[in-house]
């Protein structure tokens, strides 16, 4: 029995202090008929804490957790090994707080951590400046579209067929209220370059286009060179928005900024942040310095105080929600700061060499897995260039295959039929992600199980 420091004597003293005879006197403004009198019919008495823990543990055992099975799920959320030191550092009392650092004189540590995070994101994305993070990748993507509208004074955004369908769905929802025109498409399983609609994008850019949004690697794992697309956007006065849902890939491929992207956004979950049942995650946002005043979110900057000492502050705040709503660049009024810190700590522990090595491990494992799975009779590998994720074309609908594999304790990938319901041409698509957490034995287990499923 836990000790609760509120005795009958304490309660009586408190009531006497405020001049109330009983607890009921505190609710005299609530009509008698609306007050709860006695227990609720049909609702059992509360259980003890121990009983609740046992009940929740029984429920949890019904789940198939990522660490208990060969795991090949991806499509925007990836399982990577996160060193224990990351959680240890972010749980320090100085960081584990919901406090927003509006008062720099008492928040120098938090502000410096955000400044370092921004520096890392800007370098990773090949951009001049980054903000202190957004909610997640999908909201960062939408904010990039609205930023492009402000910069170009145009309202037509062209979305690549390889953009994550959840990102597209969010953009369509928001565009209903903003009036933005979205030109979207669904991917195909063209062998060699699945989901790559570069020809469509190049042809669609015109004088009304505010931006082109392209994901790299895309939803099907295809990796593309964005240089030609960036040049065409700039020729027509539009911006190129690049989306990165797997930042580990940037340890192996050229950054979007190097390829000419004006705005780069993404999901930072795969570095430092666990799967977490889908959230909270950390949205990444970076851009060219000439557009910084139109960039949403908070910015931590460095300055000097009256004594010449270096200090960190929230800067360019007139872009944000501190001013009139209709004038603000964004009305997102917070961010997943702790997740941003986890991202920064993990990336710091890796360093440039470590990130490159991690990327090499992922790519090598994915190549080996793709070669093995393509040997399964009836299975076709549709990717040419990919990083740690690729798409298989099965001879039957992939969704029931995925469910059957899960019943056997194998999380074998993401069915495109789940992401694109009703699209028969994509029903046989299976997206497989291979990170450093997947062993050769895991791949062989998946290959044998997949072969048995297809032969059944």
UniProtKB/Swiss-Prot annotation:
It is an enzyme of class 1 (oxidoreductase). GO terms for biological process: glycine decarboxylation via glycine cleavage system; nucleoside metabolic process. Keywords: Oxidoreductase. GO terms for molecular function: glycine dehydrogenase (decarboxylating) activity. Its EC number is 1.4.4.2. Pfam families: GDC-P. InterPro entries: GcvPA, GDC-P_N, GDC_P, PyrdxlP-dep_Trfase, PyrdxlP-dep_Trfase_major, PyrdxlP-dep_Trfase_small. It catalyses: N(6)-[(R)-lipoyl]-L-lysyl-[glycine-cleavage complex H protein] + glycine + H(+) = N(6)-[(R)-S(8)-aminomethyldihydrolipoyl]-L-lysyl-[glycine-cleavage complex H protein] + CO2. It comes from the Bacteria. The glycine cleavage system is composed of four proteins: P, T, L and H. In this organism, the P 'protein' is a heterodimer of two subunits. Belongs to the GcvP family. N-terminal subunit subfamily. HAMAP family: GcvPA. This is Probable glycine dehydrogenase (decarboxylating) subunit 1. It comes from Rhizorhabdus wittichii (strain DSM 6014 / CCUG 31198 / JCM 15750 / NBRC 105917 / EY 4224 / RW1) (Sphingomonas wittichii). The lineage of its organism: Bacteria, Pseudomonadati, Pseudomonadota, Alphaproteobacteria, Sphingomonadales.
């Amino acid at each position: 029995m836990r000790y609760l420091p509120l005795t009958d004597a304490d309660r009586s003293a408190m009531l006497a202090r405020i001049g109330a005879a009983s607890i009921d006197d505190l609710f005299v403004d609530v009509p008698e008929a609306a007050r709860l009198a006695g227990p609720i019919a049909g609702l059992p008495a509360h259980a003890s804490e121990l009983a609740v823990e046992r009940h929740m543990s029984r429920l949890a055992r019904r789940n198939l957790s990522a660490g208990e099975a060969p795991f090949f799920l991806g499509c925007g959320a990836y399982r990577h090994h996160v060193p224990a030191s990351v959680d240890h550092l972010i749980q320090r009392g100085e960081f584990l707080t919901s406090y927003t650092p509006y008062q720099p004189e008492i928040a120098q540590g938090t502000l410096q951590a955000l400044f370092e995070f921004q520096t890392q994101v800007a370098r990773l994305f090949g951009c001049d400046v980054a903000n202190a993070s957004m909610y997640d990748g999908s909201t960062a993507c939408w904010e990039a579209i609205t930023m492009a509208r402000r910069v170009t004074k145009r309202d037509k955004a062209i979305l690549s067929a390889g953009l994550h369908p959840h990102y597209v769905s969010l953009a369509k929802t928001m565009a209903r209220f903003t009036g933005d025109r979205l030109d979207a498409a669904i991917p195909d399983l063209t062998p060699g370059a699945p989901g790559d609609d570069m020809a469509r994008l190049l042809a669609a850019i015109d004088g009304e286009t505010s931006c082109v949004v392209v994901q790299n690697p895309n939803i099907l794992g295809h990796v593309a060179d964005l240089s030609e697309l960036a040049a065409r956007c700039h020729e027509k006065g539009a911006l190129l928005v690049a989306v990165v849902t797997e930042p580990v890939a940037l340890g192996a491929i050229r950054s979007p900024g190097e390829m000419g992207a004006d705005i780069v956004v993404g999901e930072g979950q795969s570095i430092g942040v666990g799967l977490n049942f889908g959230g909270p995650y950390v949205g990444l946002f970076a851009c060219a310095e000439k557009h910084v005043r139109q960039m949403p979110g908070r910015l931590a900057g460095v300055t000097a105080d009256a004594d010449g000492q270096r200090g960190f502050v929230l800067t360019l705040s007139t872009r944000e929600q501190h001013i009139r709503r209709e004038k603000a660049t964004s009305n997102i009024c917070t961010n997943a700061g702790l997740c941003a810190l986890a991202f920064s700590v993990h990336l710091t522990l890796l360093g440039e060499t470590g990130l490159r090595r991690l990327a090499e491990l992922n790519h090598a494992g994915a190549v080996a897995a793709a070669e093995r799975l393509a040997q399964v009779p009836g299975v076709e590998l549709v990717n040419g260039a990919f990083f740690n994720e690729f798409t298989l074309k099965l001879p039957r609908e992939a969704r029931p295959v995925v469910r059957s594999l899960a019943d056997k304790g194998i999380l074998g990938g993401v069915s495109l039929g789940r992401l694109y319901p009703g699209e028969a041409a994509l029903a046989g698509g299976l997206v497989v992600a291979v990170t450093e957490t997947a062993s050769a034995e895991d791949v062989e287990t998946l290959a044998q199980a997949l072969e048995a499923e297809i032969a059944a």
